[in-house]
């Protein structure tokens, strides 16, 4: 998939270089994945999360090849992961954002025969911090039978299931299924 820039953002030099030779970089990306991808240590940035009202340590994996590998793996695994996912799992899923969840809750409250008036929003305290590679791999083994893909998934998590890495939100949702 080609990178879509925000109209006011300056395109990243790495993205420009990759998109100038897409065929060459696709072949190179395939070689990297097939020959044993090794994740580089991500840069950790401390960011203020307005919605949660606290500081978060966000990992920033390198754009090439790390983020491209993350997206390539998830493109392949998305249909498999979506198959068993709850219809109302809204976190970080394309087409299922906060509005999707809010619309469902409003409908439930409106059409509930028992007259429910309230709903609850829950959060798992330090969820990403508590996820281990072993826990995620156990969940993935139930969904994925290809040993090579499982090996790539394990290599993605060399530094853990990090907030900020694209694959992390998908793997976290898989654990919650």
Name what the model sees in each region.
Residues 28-54, 68, 145-159:
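Reverse-transcriptase-like RNA-dependent polymerase core
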Residues 104-177:
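Conserved polymerase palm-domain catalytic core
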Residues 54-85, 128, 159-177:
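Conserved pre-motif C helix in the palm subdomain of viral-like polymerases
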Residues 70, 74, 78, 94-103, ...:
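Well-ordered mid-protein domain cores that form the structural environment of catalytic cofactors
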Residues 2-11, 49-52, 81-85, 118:
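Short acidic (Asp/Glu) and glycine-rich catalytic loops that position anionic groups and cofactors
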Residues 85-94:
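Short, glycine/acidic-rich hinge or "gate" loops at secondary-structure transitions
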Residues 1-31:
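Non-catalytic, polymerase-adjacent accessory regions of viral genome-replication enzymes
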Residues 51, 62, 94, 109, ...:
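Short, flexible loop/turn elements at secondary-structure junctions
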């Amino acid at each position: 998939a080609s990178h879509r820039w925000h109209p006011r953002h300056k395109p990243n030099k790495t993205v420009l270089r990759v998109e100038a030779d897409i065929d060459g970089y696709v072949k190179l990306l395939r070689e990297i994945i097939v020959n044993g991808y090794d994740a580089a240590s991500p840069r950790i940035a401390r960011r203020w999360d307005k919605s949660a009202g606290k500081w978060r340590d966000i990992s920033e994996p390198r754009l090439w090849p790390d983020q491209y590998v993350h997206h390539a793996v998830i493109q392949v695994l998305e249909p498999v992961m979506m198959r068993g996912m709850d219809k109302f799992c809204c976190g970080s899923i394309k087409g299922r954002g906060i509005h999707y969840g809010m619309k469902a809750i409003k409908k439930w409250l409106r059409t509930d025969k028992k007259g429910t008036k309230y709903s609850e929003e829950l959060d798992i305290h330090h969820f990403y911090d508590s996820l281990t590679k072993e826990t995620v791999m156990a969940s993935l083994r139930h969904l994925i039978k290809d040993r090579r893909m499982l090996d790539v998934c394990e290599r993605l998590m060399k530094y853990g299931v990090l907030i900020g890495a694209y694959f992390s939100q998908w793997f976290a949702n898989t654990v919650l299924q």
